[in-house]
């Protein structure tokens, strides 16, 4: 394949922030033309703001489907742009994220370019009523569009209780959880066999374990 390309890299650091940007520009042979002006960007920004919030943003976009792979700039078949903010405070974790995916394959370009607006996640772990008992709560919400031409919303929750017991014959443990999921499917392809509507699931689970710690000295 004939043509020429230019990759420009820019990096900037300040305070608690960092920006790294790669810009690709080229005049090359594509499947459309002998010479076509094409371009792409791959940029990453990270920062810590406020009271312990970690912010990350990625911008990845290309003006043409194949030139990044064909000329060895990037071998991925899709480019994902996203922005997220996360925070950990003691025994709690928070995450908010939005993303959009650009497919580099013409065959699935209109049906598999997922957009997430947004994804929200919360987790908390705390001691239970007894010394070696732990209680974990996990809650998440998701709006997902254009996933194989489906649009859906999902809410999930996990409530988990676990405990360990020291015995003369080793350590026994149990873990029990209750998982709840609620789905709202509000868009689908005409040919799909799935049905639009709302669905909910409640799933209990229980596991029991035993282990025997062994110490070896030399």
Language-model region placement:
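Outer-membrane beta-barrel proteins and related beta-barrel translocases across Gram-negative bacteria
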Residues: 1-218
């Amino acid at each position: 394949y004939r043509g020429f390309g230019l990759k420009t890299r820019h990096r900037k650091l300040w305070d608690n922030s960092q920006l790294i940007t790669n810009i690709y520009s080229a005049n090359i042979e594509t499947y459309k033309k002998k010479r076509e002006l094409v371009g792409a960007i791959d940029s990453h920004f990270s920062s810590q703001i406020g009271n312990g919030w970690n912010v990350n943003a990625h911008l990845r976009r290309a003006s043409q489907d194949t030139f990044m792979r064909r000329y060895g700039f990037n071998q991925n078949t899709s480019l994902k742009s996203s922005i997220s903010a996360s925070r950990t405070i003691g025994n709690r974790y928070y995450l908010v994220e939005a993303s959009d995916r650009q497919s580099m394959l013409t065959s699935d370009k209109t049906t598999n370019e997922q957009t997430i607006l947004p994804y929200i996640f919360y987790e908390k772990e705390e001691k239970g009523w007894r010394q070696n008992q732990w209680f974990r709560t996990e809650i998440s919400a998701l709006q997902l569009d254009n996933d194989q031409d489906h649009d859906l919303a999902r809410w999930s929750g996990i409530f988990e209780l676990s405990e360990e017991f020291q015995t003369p014959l080793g350590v026994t443990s149990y873990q029990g959880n209750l998982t709840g999921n609620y789905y709202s499917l509000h868009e689908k392809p005409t040919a799909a066999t799935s049905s639009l509507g709302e669905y909910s699931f409640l799933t209990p689970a229980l596991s029991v374990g035993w282990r025997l710690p062994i110490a070896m000295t030399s």
